[in-house]
Amino acid sequence: MIFPGPKVFIFDMDSTLIHADCDVTWKSFAVRHGLAPESAIAEADKFYEDYKAGCLDPVAFMRFQLAEFIGNTPEEMAEPCRMHFEEFIRENCYAEALQLVKELRERKIPTAILTSTNTEIAAPTAAYFGVDELMGTRLAVENGRFTGTIAGEYAVRAGKIAPARDFVMRHGATLAETAYYGDSTNDLDLLKVVGYPVAANPCPELRRIAEENNWRIIDFK
């Protein structure tokens, strides 16, 4: 499954490596465990549709998405994030994606997940895949507790380019020597600047763009 050329492989997470979107499943988890009202599921679905359409309001979304984190410490949220992975994500990890990352690790090729999902929720998935690094939206902490806001830039669309460039440079490579796997048009900014763009389980619009540009297309199972 490894193709020749790239010195570094970077993967989007939701709907790319896993058959799920953690921003949606997190709210389902929160409702299941009494951390959020039933109405949160429909609201999460609405934000997800906005995300796919490229019109997500990041401020409103983060205010909603991080409600369960506010006032808690990273240590206190580690167990809910682990439980979320076990209940919603583990069984939805694509076997072929797991095998690809395993083969890359065996060949000592640097790998990373770069996701718009916050790194607290994404951490168990990154650990399960065994990638070298997790990059994503970081949460702000003051006095040891989550504030409900983000630290730095929201890792979506063009916000993925800087962390990707930093990662590959630290591994002695350039974006031109990098493969990036993404599933939606929100990944286009990074797909356009890497040397080896891969449309993975692409939405119809990304599949069309990938075909027009002769990009690799893969559908993980």
Role assignments for model-derived ranges:
Residues K46-R63, N143-G144, I150, A164:
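N-terminal-biased segments
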Residues A53, F69-T73, V156:
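A generic short alpha-helical patch detector that favors 3-5-residue windows
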Residues M1-L56:
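Active-site neighborhood of HAD-like aspartate-dependent phosphohydrolases
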Residues M1-P6, E79, E86-K221:
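C-terminal cap/substrate-recognition subdomain and adjoining C-terminal extension
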Residues D21, N72, G159:
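Conserved active-site and cofactor/substrate-binding residues in soluble primary-metabolism enzymes
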Residues A60-E96:
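Metal-dependent phosphoesterase signature
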